[in-house]
UniProtKB/Swiss-Prot annotation:
<keyword id="KW-0997">Cell inner membrane</keyword>
<feature type="transmembrane region" description="Helical">
    <location>
        <begin position="11"/>
        <end position="31"/>
    </location>
</feature>
<dbReference type="GO" id="GO:0016655">
    <property type="term" value="F:oxidoreductase activity, acting on NAD(P)H, quinone or similar compound as acceptor"/>
</dbReference>
<feature type="transmembrane region" description="Helical">
    <location>
        <begin position="186"/>
        <end position="206"/>
    </location>
</feature>
<comment type="similarity">
    <text>Belongs to the complex I subunit 1 family.</text>
</comment>
<dbReference type="GO" id="GO:0003954">
    <property type="term" value="F:NADH dehydrogenase activity"/>
</dbReference>
<feature type="transmembrane region" description="Helical">
    <location>
        <begin position="149"/>
        <end position="169"/>
    </location>
</feature>
<dbReference type="InterPro" id="IPR001694">
    <property type="entry name" value="NADH_UbQ_OxRdtase_su1/FPO"/>
</dbReference>
<comment type="subunit">
    <text>NDH-1 is composed of 13 different subunits. Subunits NuoA, H, J, K, L, M, N constitute the membrane sector of the complex.</text>
</comment>
<dbReference type="GO" id="GO:0009060">
    <property type="term" value="P:aerobic respiration"/>
</dbReference>
<keyword id="KW-0472">Membrane</keyword>
<keyword id="KW-1003">Cell membrane</keyword>
<feature type="transmembrane region" description="Helical">
    <location>
        <begin position="237"/>
        <end position="257"/>
    </location>
</feature>
<dbReference type="InterPro" id="IPR018086">
    <property type="entry name" value="NADH_UbQ_OxRdtase_su1_CS"/>
</dbReference>
<feature type="transmembrane region" description="Helical">
    <location>
        <begin position="304"/>
        <end position="324"/>
    </location>
</feature>
<dbReference type="GO" id="GO:0005886">
    <property type="term" value="C:plasma membrane"/>
</dbReference>
<feature type="transmembrane region" description="Helical">
    <location>
        <begin position="265"/>
        <end position="285"/>
    </location>
</feature>
Amino acid sequence: MSWFTPEVIDILISIVKAVVILLVVVTCGAFMSFGERRLLGLFQNRYGPNRVGWGGSLQLVADMIKMFFKEDWVPKFSDRVIFTLAPMIAFTSLLLAFAIVPVSPTWAVSDLNIGILFFLMMAGLAVYAVLFAGWSSNNKYSLLGAMRASAQTLSYEVFIGLSLMGVVAQADSFNMQAIVESQAHMWNVIPQFFGFITFAIAGVAVCHRHPFDQPEAEQELADGYHIEYSGMKFGLFFVGEYIGIVTVSALIVTLFFGGWQGPFLPPFVWFALKTAFFMMMFILIRAALPRPRYDQVMSFGWKVCLPLTLLNLLATAAVILYNAQ
C-alpha cells in the first residue's frame, strides 16, 4: 500500500466531495420539477399532482419511468451527431457551472481563482447547445426558436457579467471563497443592490424561465428549439433547466447573501436554506408574472438592465477610489 500516500487520500476525498455535491445538485433539480407543480397548484388554488404515491410523492419516479421508456426518435433529415450532442452539452454545462460554488468553507467541487470567469464560460457554452438543437433538427420552427433563445441568452449574459464586476471589484478577487469571506461584516446585497437586481433578472432570462421563456413557450413557435426531441434527450433539456435554476440560486446566495455564512447553524445548512428560498422565488415569479412579448424582453435588457449595470459599476468604482484616499 505504498501508493496510499496523504496526497492520494486528499485526491480521493476531493473526488468524493465533487461527486456528492454534483449528485445533490442533480437530485435537487429533478425534485424541483415536482415541487414546482405542487406549489403552482397551491398558488392557483388547485391540487397539483397528487395521485402517484402518498400526496403525489412518487410523481417524479413515474415521470422518469415514462420518459425513459418513450421512443428515442430522431428526425430523418437531421444531423444525428449534433442532434445527440446538444442535450448532453446543455445538461453538462449547467451542471459544471455549479462546480465553483462553495457549499461550506471546506466543501466545493473546485476552488478556482477564476471562479466567476469559469461560470461565465459554462453559461456561454450552454448557448451552443441551443443552437445545435435548433439547427440539427432540420425544422424551421426549431431553428427560429433557437435563434431567439440564443439572442436572448447572449444579451442577458452581458448583463450578468457586468453585474458581477461590482462584486469582483469590492472583493478584489474572482475566487468564490474570497467573495464569501469578504461578506463577513456586510452582505454584498446592500452595497451592490442594483447589481443583485440585474443579476437576478438576467439569471431568470438565461435559464429561459418565465417570464423570459418566449423561445420555448408552448404558445410561441410550436414549443421552441427542442420541438423534435423526445425520450431521455428531452429529459436532459428538461432537468438541465432546473439545474440552471439551482445554480443561479446558489450563485445569488454566494455572491450577494453571504454564501454559507450565518449564526448557530452549520454552514452547509445556511447555504441550503438560502438557496431553497431563491429556488422558491423562481416558482413564485412563474406563478405571478405575465409573459411579455419577445421585443419587450430584448428592449428591457438593453434599455434598462445595461444602463443599470453600468451605473452600478461606476458607483462602485467611485466608492473604491474614495476609500483608497
